[in-house]
Swiss-Prot record:
Active-site residues from the entry: 140, 168, 232
Catalytic activity: a 1,2-diacyl-sn-glycero-3-phosphocholine + H2O = a 2-acyl-sn-glycero-3-phosphocholine + a fatty acid + H(+)
Function: Catalyzes the hydrolysis of phosphatidylcholine with phospholipase A1 activity. May act as an allergen and induce hemolytic activity.
Nucleotide-binding recorded as keyword: no
PROSITE patterns referenced in this protein's UniProt entry, alphabetically: LIPASE_SER (PS00120)
UniProt superkingdom: Eukaryota
CDD domains membership: Pancreat_lipase_like (cd00707)
Catalytic activity, EC: 3.1.1.32
Record's keyword terms, sorted: Allergen, Disulfide bond, Hydrolase, Lipid degradation, Lipid metabolism, Secreted
Protein name as catalogued: Phospholipase A1 2
Gene3D superfamilies assigned: alpha/beta hydrolase
Length: 303
């Protein structure tokens, strides 16, 4: 038929595995990993393993994820796993049909979440990766997938993921849903959400901390015509800059808005990014932002 299939075969989901030794990454499937000698003599117990999960009509090779992978590897000797579920995300469909496929892509998110939960279980049980070293980072539908992975993983009774970072979690089809059917603060010990678009994302609070960047909509520097898509993907770029630069974006508690960032202390404000959970404050934060990369609002201040 004419309708897009956006067909997802879990066994065919692939991923790009990148390390400092192999920055360009190796394309693998879970089957190859299980049968391969890849980690035969590697001790992975000290390795941090972030999973990156792309969104609708995207893929693991998208420049934004490649940039984030590079930033993560520059910072730390880790193993980055970028999940590629492009078929299920309608990325290979005919241009005009891609968008009609959205409900199908939404349907596929649970299966991808289950795949990631199974994958992390294998890493922990077979390759001795420590649960405390796993972190999920997902954008748009990928953020919803991270939530489903968190729910699935808890069924194994091995504990909870330490952290999920949801980058502008997809709003359409999820806005009115309750916890079991969307990303939720109980999906990991710490769930960090960046809100950057009110139409493609959601204004609803979802995590342990919710950062509303520029009030969570219409990002500066995004022009009117492609504004929504630009604002939506900005969440990925913001996190990449926060990986590159410590305390690049500082969040002010919503209750204190419009307090300037310069008045922030470590006890009341929180830095967006990999160290957010080191700060005591939880809840909703307002994050002013610049229009151009590196977007930082801290003027060199580190709290």
């Amino acid at each position: 038929g004419i309708l897009p299939e956006c067909k997802l075969v879990p066994e065919e989901i692939s991923f790009v595995l990148s390390t400092r030794e192999n920055r360009d990454g190796v394309y693998l499937t879970l089957q190859k990993l299980k049968n391969g000698k890849m980690f035969k003599n590697s001790d992975l117990s000290s390795k941090k393993v972030p999973f990156l999960i792309h969104g609708f009509i995207s893929s693991a090779t998208n420049k934004n994820y490649a940039d984030m992978t590079r930033a993560l590897l520059d910072k730390d000797d880790i193993m980055v796993i970028s999940i590629d579920w492009r078929d299920g995300a309608c990325s290979n469909e005919f241009a005009l049909l891609k968008f009609i496929g959205y409900p199908k892509a939404v349907e596929n998110t649970r299966a991808v979440g289950k795949y990631i939960a199974d994958f992390s279980k294998i890493l922990i049980q077979k390759y001795k990766v420590l649960l405390e070293n796993i972190r999920l980072i997902g954008h748009s539908l990928g953020a919803q997938i991270a939530g489903f992975a968190g729910k699935e993983f808890q069924r194994f009774k091995l504990g909870k993921y330490p952290e999920i970072i949801g980058l502008d979690p997809a709003g359409p089809s999820f806005k009115k849903k309750d916890c079991p059917e969307r990303i939720c603060e109980t999906d990991a010990h710490y769930v960090q959400i960046l809100h950057t678009s009110s139409n493609l994302g959601t204004e609803r609070t979802l995590g342990t901390v919710d950062f509303y960047i520029n009030d969570g909509s219409n990002q500066p520097g995004c022009t009117y015509i492609i504004g929504e898509t630009c604002s939506h993907t900005r969440a990925v770029k913001y996190l990449t800059e926060c990986i590159r630069r410590e305390c690049c974006l500082i969040g002010v508690p919503q209750s204190k808005n419009p307090q300037p960032v310069s008045k922030c202390t470590r006890n009341e404000c929180v830095c967006v990014g990999l160290n957010a959970k080191e700060y005591p404050k939880k809840g909703s934060f307002y994050v002013p932002v610049e229009a151009k990369a590196p977007f930082c609002n801290n003027n060199g201040k580190i709290i």
